[in-house]
């Protein structure tokens, strides 16, 4: 049977939605299992049908689905797949969400707004998820939204080690694109033994995806600056931050982010930016128009596979990141 790995009395089965099958196959390969064959299609009116081709009874099931565009469709498919596993008598259901949709809606900025990140967690729990495994949440408090264990994985080791191997560390400055990412940037500084700078920005709450950059805090003149963020969506924030760094005398700018959302005008902005390299992981598929020489995509599959193995074998996911 495909997708089964047995340890003693335990049985692992690995499932994938249709959002990012390449990542699913790579994770399954690292685990030494196959992806369980699944029949999935859309009805004429847009409803989604799912049926697994093998029994999941008594199995520890791991279901991977990244929330890429069209995001609402893939979230709904994931919920349907969770429900199908629950009704198929799965022993446990671990939902792997490399990119957690709606994570930016993690609190009410103003009255009469939803907390959509909490809603996503509630929907997964109601559908039947026992555990969530995700990568670089937009904010840490989202871990508390789900009524069950949440394994929060980090791409920092992959991204930082890649940059550290390419750049003369004596010239390197780690830059946070805003005050909210300073703690993550600090961990980069510790890993690369580099100083920290911050780009101060203000966002117009009434205009989506519009950012005004004001000032750079820290010395970036003549330095190779590494901008670190969790995601890049339209590219407005990060490209404006890069422009501010160049205006303050930076020699070069490299941008790193775990999640390359890359919506709307992102393609043109990244192509036309003075940034020498954009580095992402493959938590999300990269659009074809963004397969550029200046874009590097690193594999997150080993990190996810190692975490899945620890969960299945009742090990420690935390131990995978102790060196941070």
Curated annotation (Swiss-Prot):
Keywords: ATP-binding, Cytoplasm, Kinase, Magnesium, Metal-binding, Nucleotide biosynthesis, Nucleotide-binding, Transferase
Residues at the active site: 201
InterPro entries per UniProt: PRib_PP_synth_CS, Pribosyltran_N, PRibTrfase_dom, PRTase-like, Rib-P_diPkinase, Rib-P_diPkinase_bac
Main location: cytoplasm
Residue numbers binding D-ribose 5-phosphate: 203, 229, 233-237
GO molecular function: ATP binding; kinase activity; magnesium ion binding; ribose phosphate diphosphokinase activity
Keyword Nucleotide-binding applies: yes
Binding locations of Mg(2+) 2: 178
Binding site for ATP: 45-47, 104-105
Binding site for Mg(2+) 1: 138
Localization in the cell: Cytoplasm
CC cofactor: Mg(2+)
UniProt-listed Gene3D superfamilies: 3.40.50.2020
Pathway(s) where this gene product acts: Metabolic intermediate biosynthesis; 5-phospho-alpha-D-ribose 1-diphosphate biosynthesis; 5-phospho-alpha-D-ribose 1-diphosphate from D-ribose 5-phosphate (route I): step 1/1
Pfam family, one: Pribosyl_synth
A GO BP annotation: ribonucleoside monophosphate biosynthetic process
Keyword Transmembrane: no
EC numbers: 2.7.6.1
Function: Involved in the biosynthesis of the central metabolite phospho-alpha-D-ribosyl-1-pyrophosphate (PRPP) via the transfer of pyrophosphoryl group from ATP to 1-hydroxyl of ribose-5-phosphate (Rib-5-P).
Subunit structure: Homohexamer.
Family annotation (PANTHER family): RIBOSE-PHOSPHATE DIPHOSPHOKINASE FAMILY MEMBER, RIBOSE-PHOSPHATE PYROPHOSPHOKINASE 1, CHLOROPLASTIC
Family from the record: Belongs to the ribose-phosphate pyrophosphokinase family. Class I subfamily.
Entry protein name: Ribose-phosphate pyrophosphokinase
Species, as recorded: Streptomyces avermitilis (strain ATCC 31267 / DSM 46492 / JCM 5070 / NBRC 14893 / NCIMB 12804 / NRRL 8165 / MA-4680)
Chain's gene name: prs
